[in-house]
Amino acid sequence: MAARVVLDEFTAPAEKAALLERSRGRIEALFGVGLAVLGALGAEEPLPARIWLQLRGAQEAVHSAKEYIKGICEPELEEKECYPKAMHCIFVGAQSLFLKSLIQDTCADLCVLDTGLLGIRGSAEAVVMARSHIQQFVKLFESNENLPSNQRESEIKREFRQFVEAHADSYTMDLLILPTSLKKELLSLTQGEESLFETDDDVITVGDVRPPEYTQSAATGPSSARDEVVVQEDSRNKARTPVSELTKHMDTVFSSSPDVLFVPVNGLSPDEDALSKDRVCHKRRSSDTEERHTKKQFSLENVPEGELLPDGKGSAGNEVIDLSDPASNSTNLSPDGKDTTEEMEYNILVNFFKTMGYSQEIVEKVIREYGPSTEPLLLLEEIEKENKRLQEDRDFPPCTVYPDASQSRNAGVGSTTNELTADSTPKKAQSHTEQSMVERFSQLPFKDSKHCTSNCKVNSFRTVPVGQKQEIWGSKQNSSCTVDLETDGHSASAASASPKDISFVSRGASGHQQRNPAFPENGFQQQTEPLLPNNTKPACEKRSGSCSSPQPKPNYPPLSPPLPLPQLLPSVTEARLGGSSDHIDSSVTGVQRFRDTLKIPYKLELKNEPGRADLKHIVIDGSNVAITHGLKKFFSCRGIAIAVEYFWKLGNRNITVFVPQWRTRRDPNITEQHFLTQLQELGILSLTPARMVFGERIASHDDRFLLHLADKTGGIIVTNDNFREFVTESVSWREIITKRLLQYTFVGDIFMVPDDPLGRNGPRLEEFLRKEAFLRHMQPLLNALPSVGTFDPGFRSPSTQVANNSHQPPPRIQTSSSPWLPQQSHFTALATLPSMQQNPPLPAQRSSAETSELREALLKIFPDSEQKLKIDQILAAHPYMKDLNALSALVLD
């Protein structure tokens, strides 16, 4: 029932007159009212502090507009509300109609300040209501829950899609993939405001941006409403949205390749599929059949009437369909054009997930299992799970499988067969056939290996919907047991085919692709060479005993009755050991190789033993090391742990790793974050500050922390960065960048550093890592130990070999987990110096006369009384040292 027209007058601050004049058109369009700024009544001097305003329209609309105007003129609250960036389409998409509806519902003034940030002002009640709405939207978006079963989810999806496409813009695709519960909330928000704009004498539309005139009449009647619908439909047809553009492009692709065979999702037979090419898919359908596939029902509005289709036939009809007549929609459009839309929908879904980096086989498998009408976010989760499962299974190579492996899994055959059945046999009869098939095939020794030794040829297959009847086995079978199944892809010989078994393959391609045999010829399991590489044998032997030993089997007679595909598939697929992957990419990628290395377990082990005090502080650029180990694609925390363990084994105990704090957040590109936690608990990891402000990250430059710590501790920075931007900051930083950067490289999980960090003419690694003070202390001591050898600070060439061969470093056994260590004799001899001092004879001690002479000489050099006590302590602590220069150095330190 239309509301009564009312007239309301009220006052507002005079200084807001200019603001109201500028906002009048927007206010009238928002609330469907007429606004007049009357100003001050009479010619008063000076001008009053308030002016008069007048509103005319429906009673509820006038009340809402009045509250809104009061809120922008005299706001009680002004706040900001954050929301996820993925929800930005709600407030700016669909021509901002959802934002306008939120303003109409709450009477608060809302504006988008930035992506992820809204500004809210108005009365206290209006601001609280607006914030409550926004927080409810965020909760529904993050929970991503489906509607209860008693609510018609497909109807809500259809209504929302119709509404969004009627106001199409660049955010249409983002709006269509929102959760259904959020779609319902947005629809109720927009539909709840329609009653505000109905009056006795005029009808004002929310989306109309033109301000209504008081003199406008509503006498146009039903014809004007029909014309308005037609105009809206024309404008929607002209809107070039990403959906329509993609649809047009796919129309061209499919029309140019008429030989492409497509198995529809709805399970139509090939004959019905061929007949569907003669039909025209109209843009809009509102029939009940649309409820089956409501996700991504893309429009095909640019197919002209009477246009020839690829087979040369005309369109199904040239009748004009009135969009405002629901009867015509249900009677004329429900059976027609359905297959083409589902085909388009299916291919667009597949291409969408392929662009995200997932293989086509995995995407199609998940879509077949859950259906194309499932929420894309749910499909994405399942695709990610399937992808991870296949990558984990890839770690286990295929082995020979014996009949007990197939028989022990008969319980799971039924579910797989139900999903992949190609016959419309009743379930009870079908299960009986399955059981007989399993008993027959369980006697055969199935084998899935890289080197196939039988002559049986099996082509890869694809699943077909229930109800589509198909001859799987040919009527003629020769002695070589050739099995031809419906395939996609290109034809190839069995010897050159992919070694990985029967798998799901993509739709839309023609031809046949042969796979490696899955059955032995005449029942024999022939094996003339090992089935697996040497490095994979132990893993297989642990699971199945012996993988490569020949197992002769009795000669079974060839199969006489033809068996359908559904009964064959479970035995073949279940004949894999450990769930090995049924898909392998044709080419190897760096990402795949990196993920394979992560499957090899690595444990950070830092032994609790004293270190060496002669080594410099090690400052590790954690981000640089992690990115390098992750092949520039992942932040690999394992690389940091490997670097720390390397220096720990050298004897370093002063090790610091700097990593930005935001790297501790969950991220699919950050792997094995538990290493960061472990290092932080040990006090080795330091997190540089970072914070989030309005959805934007503010992080300090971690390289500055590296340079500051290296400057204070005299340490070495382990990084491959050149710090070019910091060369001019200070002299000390320039010295660090020039002389104290240690570069590195990774070979898999092996951490390696150069023997000559500063070039061929620079110091060796041992000298580079030692403190300078230690070199001064140890030189006289090594000179006094002839059996150990002369200590050469330059390490240009070894001077004297260690007398006792037992002190030579033991031969290093290289393993996959042990880091690479330098093998210089000086480095090892110095590391084992305490143990050496027990065996070689010590030189004679100083006599009392020599000690007195040295004391007098030192007192002449250091006459202070404080140094006198230190001189006595040094002489007592070093009874063998006779070098005056060495003793002087000790006094200085």
Swiss-Prot record:
One Gene Ontology molecular-function label: mRNA binding
Taxonomic path: Eukaryota, Metazoa, Chordata, Craniata, Vertebrata
Protein name: NEDD4-binding protein 1
Protein's UniProt keywords contain Ubl conjugation: yes
Intracellular or extracellular location(s): Cytoplasm, Cytosol; Nucleus; Nucleus, Nucleolus; Nucleus, PML body
Region (CoCUN): 846-893
Biased composition (Basic and acidic residues): 225-237
Sequence segments annotated as region (Disordered): 213-243, 273-339, 394-433, 472-564, 793-820
Domain RNase NYN residues, every copy: 615-767
Organism name: Mus musculus (Mouse)
Database matches in CDD domains: KH-I_N4BP1, KH-I_N4BP1_like_rpt1, PIN_N4BP1-like
